[in-house]
Structure formats: structure tokens, C-alpha cells
Design a protein with these regions (language model features):
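Rossmann-like NAD(P)-binding element
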Residues: 53-115
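Conserved N-terminal Rossmann-fold NAD(P) cofactor-binding segment
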Residues: 33-72, 301-309
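Extreme N-terminal starter segment of soluble prokaryotic enzymes
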Residues: 2-5
Length: 309
């Protein structure tokens, strides 16, 4: 258990993340901060009132300022707006970049030794904004993408094969978007290569569904997006850090030559421990996987070029 974890943003993702953090007792205090008056306070109070039933002692606090977030060990950033009708991707990008920039400035001042887990979209670019604004080393700025995308991929494979999700080992690398790269060559069912259990056509359909995982949920909900799985993914990362578990999880990390790339955040296998990012693990890729990862990197770099910071 650490002393304090802050969740920035009290929308569906942020509030569900705060609840999961409290229920797992990963910190003595969980602070939920949001610009909308009353929302973080009300949701935090509601969560705290569930403590006697759920059996946790983590104090949940809601606030509109950053004073109570001071000296947080981990800051999970979920703040941002959803794309509105008539809004271009560049408009959305720069609006959310402005929000993340402001949040990052607060984090730099109030919690200068914190580890940041970025959840706001477009994920890989927002992680870059946070790193650039805070000046934090790459060990302390991570993006939550691969854990979520991998969970979706694993759940679809388990469903298709009618086996437990726990027996699916897999990894999805690359950017958090439709160019993500599920690694079929590293996908197994209790050690059995998935290619021995499933035909290529079914696998290809699952890869496509994984890439469109977020959009599929938005289509169903119509006025919202996913939050149960995204919050679970960010909390799994936080848990690995808090308990120094040395978990190997696919996360968006700042590359400095790994996989032949530098100067961007991209989903790669990361060892997470108490210091945050402890190691980027380079795995052998097929030529197609390497090509696809390169295309994914280009898709991440493109919006970085239109950023107005």
C-alpha cells in the first residue's frame, strides 16, 4: 500500500478507477479531482459510504483543486472530452492536449515524484504531452493501452474457443488505435499455440474485432464509451507498481532505440515495479509484425506533428 493515489477526472473511467483502487486498498487515500463542482465530492462520498459493505479502509476524497493531491505516489489521468459532432480529430487532439497540459503542470508542482499513468485519448500522444510538460523521466510516465487491448483480444479468443480467459496468454503492441498489433505468434492457450486451435480466418476476424474494440462499445452505448475494462486495466498497472510485482505488461512507453524506434510512446512489453517502468523487453517479431509495428508508430507520430503545446 502507498500513501496516496490521485485520479484526475471523475467521469465514468475516473470514478470506476477510484472505486477499484479503494476496494483493492492500494493506497491509504484515493483522491478524485475534477473541474466540475460537486461531481468528484459526490462520487467520492458515495464510494466511501460503500466501504463498510465492501470492507475497505482506503479513504476516498473528491476535490476541485490540487491541494489535496499533494505528494501523490501515482497519478492516473483520465480527464478529457469526447469527440463531438462536427469536431475534427485535430480539434479533439488539441483540446485534450490543452487539458492534459494543464493537469500535467499541476502534477509537476504538487506531486513531483509521482508516477503518471495516462488514460486520456489519444493515449500515446497524451502520454507524450505529460512527459514533455512535466519533464519526468520515462520510468515515471506510462500509457494504459496494451493491457486493455490485450484483455479484449484474450476475451474474444476465450469466447471463440470456449475456454477460460485465464488460460489465454497474449500481447497486443503498438498504438492505441486501429493500427494496434496483436501478436499472434505469442498467443497461446495454456502454452498451446493458438494457431493449432483456430483457423486463420477466425483469428483474423478476432484481430479486426480487437482493433475496433472501443468503437464496438461506443456503437452499442451511443452516448458514451467503455469504462469497466479501461479502469480495470489502469488499476492492474497501478497494482503492479504499488506491490513491486515486476509484472510484464504491454504499456505505452517512451522509446529510446527499442524496436529500432525513438522519440514516441508506443505499446511494448514493460516490466513494472515500484519505480514504474523498470525494463522494456524486446521480443523477436515476425517480419509482418515488425512491419505492422512500424505502421502503428507512424500513426502515432502523425498527430504529434499537429500538436500545439
Amino acid at each position: 500500500m502507498v500513501n496516496k493515489i490521485t485520479v484526475v477526472g471523475a467521469g465514468n473511467v475516473g470514478a470506476t478507477t477510484a472505486q477499484r483502487l479503494a476496494e483493492k486498498q492500494l493506497a491509504k487515500v484515493v483522491v478524485m479531482v475534477d473541474v466540475v463542482e460537486g461531481v468528484p465530492q459526490g462520487k467520492a462520498l458515495d464510494q466511501w459510504e460503500s466501504a463498510p459493505i465492501e470492507g475497505f479502509d482506503t479513504r476516498v476524497i473528491g476535490t476541485n483543486g490540487y491541494e489535496e493531491t499533494a505528494d501523490s505516489d501515482i497519478v492516473i489521468i483520465t480527464a478529457g472530452i469526447a469527440r463531438k459532432p462536427g469536431m475534427s480529430r485535430d480539434d479533439l487532439l488539441n483540446t485534450n492536449a490543452g487539458i492534459v497540459k494543464q493537469v500535467s503542470e499541476h502534477v509537476k508542482r504538487s506531486s513531483p515524484t509521482a508516477i503518471i499513468i495516462m488514460v486520456s485519448n489519444p493515449l500515446d500522444v497524451m502520454a507524450y504531452v505529460a512527459k514533455k510538460v512535466t519533464g519526468f523521466p520515462r520510468e515515471r510516465v506510462l500509457g494504459m493501452a496494451g493491457v486493455l487491448d490485450t484483455a479484449r483480444y484474450r476475451s474474444f479468443i476465450a469466447e471463440a474457443l470456449d475456454v477460460s480467459v485465464e488460460d489465454i496468454q497474449a500481447m497486443v503492441l503498438g498504438g492505441h488505435g486501429d493500427t494496434m498489433v496483436p501478436l499472434i505468434s505469442y498467443t497461446t492457450v495454456s502454452g498451446i499455440p493458438v494457431t493449432q486451435l483456430m483457423d486463420q480466418k477466425t483469428l483474423d476476424a478476432i484481430v479486426t474485432r480487437t482493433r475496433n474494440g472501443g468503437a464496438e462499445i461506443v456503437k452499442f452505448l451511443k452516448t458514451g464509451s467503455a469504462y469497466y475494462a479501461p479502469s480495470a486495466a489502469s488499476v492492474q498497472m497501478a497494482e503492479a507498481i504499488v506491490h513491486d510485482r515486476k509484472r510484464v505488461l504491454p504499456c505505452a512507453a517512451w522509446l529510446e532505440g527499442e524496436y529500432g524506434m525513438s522519440g514516441l510512446f508506443l505499446g511494448v512489453p514493460c516490466k513494472l515495479g515500484r519505480k514504474g517502468l523498470e525494463q522494456i523487453i524486446e521480443v523477436e517479431l515476425t517480419s509482418k509484425e515488425r512491419t505492422d509495428l512500424g505502421k502503428s508508430a507512424e500513426a502515432v507520430r502523425e498527430p504529434m506533428s499537429v500538436l500545439k503545446l
